[in-house]
């Protein structure tokens, strides 16, 4: 829908307060009356845009394991999937706007978490449970491990991107950082005897 696309582009670039319904109508090439026919207020349009963005950003399936999977390769593939989702521009923009507008729209942080990070935590937890099932890893608490892995992968690169800061030149490249995270997680949960 053109109105939603226009609202998303404007809100994510400028924030809630700096965008008017007139701007949204112009960008969507519709009349202001058409915008109000679909969304009775800027607040409702904003909330709908955030809900939509939260849901669309976290689609996708994580790699699946089998009994003979190369766990290090699968762990790398899985953490790369997580990293790409967490550090891509749109999820970072949505996160920024939720942090800025959360006090004004208290339902948005819960919706964001429930439609964004929580499904990712569940998918990663399922991955660790599969790894346990096939004895590829020994993860005592898959849910906790999933949350810790997400924060590890997001880490210093994510916070710098969130703040629109450059990553220092002496910081490891993203791929090297990811390899380090894979090795750290593997060593933490390597089954006895491996």
Each language-model region and where it sits:
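Helix-turn-helix
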Residues: 2, 6-44, 48-49
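Short loop-to-helix capping motifs
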Residues: 41, 104-106
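C-terminal peripheral helix-coil segments that are non-catalytic and often amphipathic
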Residues: 77, 81, 118, 122, ...
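Amphipathic alpha-helical packing segments from all-alpha helical-bundle domains
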Residues: 84, 88, 93, 97, ...
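Amphipathic alpha-helical linker/stalk segments
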Residues: 49-78, 84-86, 90, 94, ...
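Amphipathic alpha-helical segments that line or abut small-molecule/effector binding pockets
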Residues: 5, 72-88, 92-103, 143, ...
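Solvent-exposed, non-membrane alpha-helical residues enriched in polar/charged side chains
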Residues: 1, 8, 12, 36, ...
